[in-house]
């Protein structure tokens, strides 16, 4: 596909959207990729980083390597994600701390609309897709109610966290950030981003690179050979994840971060008890943002 500067600028903006979603525990950058119409190309491009393409790189055929991995596309997306993560990490963590109901309400509407958006691409609901959907809902719901673990902070475990979290990040409905919460490393990694802890970030990114290049092959195969079933699972993931992004929560357990700030560790959903009108408005905004992004992506194709 021939693309111009305008196209790559748009791709970078889509990457910014993915990065913003990935910073929020409970929301997936993969969901945004699906909404803006780049999911399949993203998975296929990542999958193309393999032995064959790496051979081109190490034999000095860099132009052929870049073309083989759809490099212009990937660098645009990665640049957008990086800009978003490094610029929004402080803002998102502040909003989640000081205005949690508003943030979760917006993303609740966004994820709810995304569930419809992905689900409508399922061509047929049958004895294979319905169980796949139910399994997706159950797995995602279980993940959202799991208790965060106390884990080590050595570099090998940080590497594993990168490999595991990135797989979740490219799955619509499964939040890489929330996987980091369960692994006990969300605020640790956010702190590394804010302070630019280069060693921690490089080890985490190394794990992410290994994880995403491996998992993308599995996902690409599933989408090409079992698309309806795969989409049913992904739709289930998103519906099940709504439990995590419900705006009204009660804190059951807390922890103190490295700056002495008390933050929630385990939360339970409760009935709406504050900011109800504002939250409903933000849910509607999040819902229609997905609709707008879908229409915009369709017009720009």
Region roles according to the model:
Residues 2-22, 31-301:
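Multi-pass membrane proteins that catalyze or facilitate reactions on polyprenyl-/lipid-phosphate substrates
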């Amino acid at each position: 596909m021939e693309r111009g500067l305008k196209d790559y600028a748009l791709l970078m903006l889509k990457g910014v959207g993915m990065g913003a979603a990935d910073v929020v525990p409970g929301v997936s950058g993969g969901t945004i990729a699906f909404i803006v119409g780049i999911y399949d190309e993203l998975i296929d491009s990542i999958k193309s980083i393999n032995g064959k393409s790496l051979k081109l790189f190490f034999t000095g055929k860099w132009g052929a390597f870049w073309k083989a991995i759809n490099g212009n596309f990937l660098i645009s997306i990665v640049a957008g994600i990086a800009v978003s993560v490094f610029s929004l990490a402080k803002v998102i963590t502040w909003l989640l701390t000081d205005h949690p109901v508003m943030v979760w309400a917006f993303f609740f509407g966004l994820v709810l609309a995304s569930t419809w958006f992905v689900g409508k691409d399922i061509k047929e609901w049958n004895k294979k897709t319905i169980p796949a959907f139910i399994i997706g809902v159950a797995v995602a719901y279980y993940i959202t109610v799991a208790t965060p673990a106390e884990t080590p902070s050595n570099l090998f475990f940080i590497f594993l966290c990168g490999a595991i979290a990135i797989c979740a990040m490219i799955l619509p409905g499964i939040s890489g950030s929330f996987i980091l919460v369960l692994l006990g490393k969300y605020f640790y990694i956010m702190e590394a981003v804010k302070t630019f802890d280069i060693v921690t970030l490089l080890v985490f990114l190394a794990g992410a690179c290994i994880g995403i290049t491996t998992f993308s092959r599995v996902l690409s195969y599933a989408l090409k050979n079992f698309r309806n079933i795969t989409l049913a699972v992904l739709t289930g993931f998103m519906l099940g994840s709504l439990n995590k992004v419900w705006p009204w929560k009660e804190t059951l357990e807390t922890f103190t971060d490295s700056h002495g700030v008390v933050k929630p560790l385990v939360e339970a959903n409760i009935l709406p008890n504050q900011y109800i009108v504002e939250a409903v408005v933000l849910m509607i905004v999040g819902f229609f943002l997905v609709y707008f992004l879908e229409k915009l992506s369709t017009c720009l194709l």
